């Protein structure tokens, strides 16, 4: 790794800087002093999804819309210029009229997964096929913990290996 001291005017906010809008004469941000890389008097912020005209946006102001029913819209805190970390509905939450289950902000539907993997004629296999995932052996499991496969609980059998038929 290369270690170098902070450089005011390089557009990167580094240790000791509150903002960095480029070199004096190039800076177009009224919230940032380009010579010192400090906020201008009265400014709370210079950049960020929750910064507007040098002030923090109010608490509850949406800064990132939900992309799907498995995503959660994020709102400004009123204390920071940054939008909070992207958050999702809990994994396993039913979605799309119980056709799928939320997973990391998406709603994968088993039929769509089969179609994408095996072509237009592929569909999800009968429920009985998914009972293999309760074994916790070989390729049939829900998760691994310390290298050991963990079988799926009855309610989670469709969270393990995907079974499709042509």
Swiss-Prot record:
Family matches, as SUPFAM superfamilies: Blood coagulation inhibitor (disintegrin)
**Entry annotated with the keyword Nuclease:** no
Q: Where in the cell is it found?
A: Secreted
Q: Which UniProt keywords apply?
A: Calcium, Cell adhesion impairing toxin, Disulfide bond, Glycoprotein, Hemostasis impairing toxin, Hydrolase, Metal-binding, Metalloprotease, Platelet aggregation inhibiting toxin, Protease, Secreted, Toxin, Zinc, Zymogen
Q: Which cysteines are joined by disulfide bonds?
A: 8-37, 19-32, 21-27, 31-54, 45-51, 50-76, 63-83, 70-102, 95-107, 114-164, 142-152
Q: Return the EC number.
A: 3.4.24.-
Q: What is its main location?
A: secreted
- Superkingdom of origin: Eukaryota
Q: Where is this motif: D/ECD-tripeptide?
A: 69-71
Reported tissue expression:
Expressed by the venom gland.
Biological processes per GO annotation: proteolysis
What task does this protein carry out? The hemorrhagic metalloproteinase-disintegrin-like bothrojarin-1 is a potent inhibitor of collagen-induced platelet aggregation by blockage of alpha-2/beta-1 (ITGA2/ITGB1) integrin. It does not present any fibrinogen-clotting activity.
Q: How does it assemble?
A: Monomer.
Name this protein carries in UniProt: Zinc metalloproteinase-disintegrin-like bothrojarin-1
């Amino acid at each position: 790794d290369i270690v170098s001291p902070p450089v005011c005017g390089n557009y990167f906010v580094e240790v000791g800087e509150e903002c960095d809008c480029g070199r004096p004469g190039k800076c177009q941000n009224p919230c940032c002093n380009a010579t010192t890389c400090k906020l201008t008097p009265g400014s709370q912020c210079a950049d960020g999804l929750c910064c507007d005209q040098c002030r923090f946006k109010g608490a509850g102001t949406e800064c990132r819309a939900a992309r799907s029913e498995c995503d959660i819209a994020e709102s400004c805190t009123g204390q920071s210029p940054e939008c909070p970390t992207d958050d999702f509905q809990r994994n396993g939450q039913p979605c799309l009229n119980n056709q799928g289950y939320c997973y990391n902000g998406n709603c994968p539907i088993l039929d769509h997964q089969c179609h994408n993997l095996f072509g237009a004629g592929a569909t999800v296999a009968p429920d009985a096929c998914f009972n293999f995932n309760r074994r916790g052996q070989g390729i049939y499991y829900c998760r691994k913990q310390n290298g050991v496969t963990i079988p799926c609980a009855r309610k989670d059998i469709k969270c393990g290996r995907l079974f499709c038929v042509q």
